[in-house]
Design a protein with these regions (language model features):
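Flexible hinge/capping segments at coil-to-helix
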Residues: 119-135, 159-161
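Hydrophobic/proline-rich hinge and linker segments of small-molecule sensing/allosteric domains
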Residues: 105-126
Length: 188
């Protein structure tokens, strides 16, 4: 079974091609994974404009599934739950390595799609100010997580799990604004 991934700096399209299908319904469908947030606007646009449906025609049923972050989407790809997906570079590279090359990186989709934001009143004006703070990420092992770890390292900081003083907390994308408003997290 061959799996393919389209990759970019911050956002990626994953294309999985299964070698065998068991029934006609599955053979006539494409299962698409995506993130339901603005940082993955290309996939949202494809879904809203029915780009895949228009490209493949009425004989192909396109099924869309939303994911919170890349690692969960890669698991779905490996499980055969999706054929195509839009993910970040770290999960794409991880999938390529884990699959011994069966997942191939094909193409970039965007550049510079991740930023670090702070909640109002958090007293953060730079990375060093994250000391003693809580930072939300969508999922451990995704692009935002590894980008944050690199930012912390470059600033001489470490997460609490490595003996440092920055708490890194996995928070679903849809819950970040409320977590910030409650003061549960200081940055995301």
């Amino acid at each position: 079974m061959k799996k393919l991934i389209l990759t970019g700096i911050m956002l990626l399209m994953v294309l999985g091609v299964s070698g065998c299908r068991n029934n006609n319904d599955e053979a006539n469908s494409i299962k698409v994974g995506y993130f339901n947030n603005v940082t993955h606007a290309q996939a949202l646009l494809m879904k809203s404009e029915k780009s895949l449906e228009n490209t493949f025609g009425k004989d192909i049923n396109v099924k869309w599934t939303a994911f919170n972050a890349g690692p969960a989407e890669v698991e779905a790809l490996f499980a055969g739950d999706i054929d195509i997906g839009y993910i970040g570079p770290v999960p794409a590279i991880s999938a390529n390595v884990k699959s011994n090359g069966d997942v191939q990186i094909l193409s970039g989709a965007a550049k510079g799609g991740a930023i670090l934001i702070r909640r109002e009143g958090a007293q953060i004006s730079g990375v060093k100010d994250l000391a003693g703070k809580t930072v939300a990420i969508p999922q451990i092992g995704n692009t935002q997580h590894l980008s944050l770890l690199k930012l912390l390292e470059d600033s001489g900081l470490k997460p609490v799990t490595e003996g440092g003083n920055v708490t890194v907390s996995a928070v679903a994308n849809a819950d970040v604004a409320n977590a910030m408003a409650r003061g549960d997290v200081d940055a995301a």
